[in-house]
Amino acid sequence: VKYVHYIKNFLKNNDCKTLLDYGCGKGHLYMEEHYESVTDVIKEPLPYFWNLDSYHLYDPGYEDFKVLPTEKYDAVICTDVMEHVPEEDLGWVIREIFSYAKKMVFVNVACFEALKKFRDGTNVHVSVFHHQDWLQFLAHESCNHKDLTIYPFFDGFFEDDVDHVLTQGYQIDSYPRIIQFQ
């Protein structure tokens, strides 16, 4: 929810009218009957708030959304997903995400362990890396997608402030050139 306004601006700036939410969860923010129970940050479901012509929700963990799309979309967003992907699968997952985008990708990654654990005690955030490592990984993977603008946002504890989760946002464009948002 905290990124809906950022994403709205990125969609507008990149003239995006179609969207894939890769790892959408239950997709409640997209549904007229559910979005109000999830947040008061927006006053309408995301397709209207973002002025989308069409969208596709994908999440292999939910029966209603487990079908991969068959087409490309102007934008792909992926929030709170990559840290749950085992390290050995990160490459193919991000390449798959990039392959569905025509114009832009928004990726949000938590760079810290989660409070939740699997039954065996393993943290559910199985790929926890420093935001600079994520940034370099995404920049490297974006080299084969020079037509895309990538917006990675990282949540973490920065500059030894362990009391507050902070967010740092970047833009990776066609060079690849990395720009930090201030």
Give, region by region, the residue ranges found by the protein language model.
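A short beta-strand submotif of the Rossmann-like class I SAM-dependent methyltransferase core
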Residues: 75-81
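Alpha/beta-hydrolase-fold catalytic nucleophile elbow
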Residues: 108
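Conserved beta-strand->loop/alpha-helix structural units within folded catalytic cores of enzymes
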Residues: 81, 96-97
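Conserved N-terminal segment of class I S-adenosyl-L-methionine
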Residues: 1-75, 91-94, 100, 111-137, ...
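Conserved acidic-Pro-Pro-aromatic motif
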Residues: 99-105
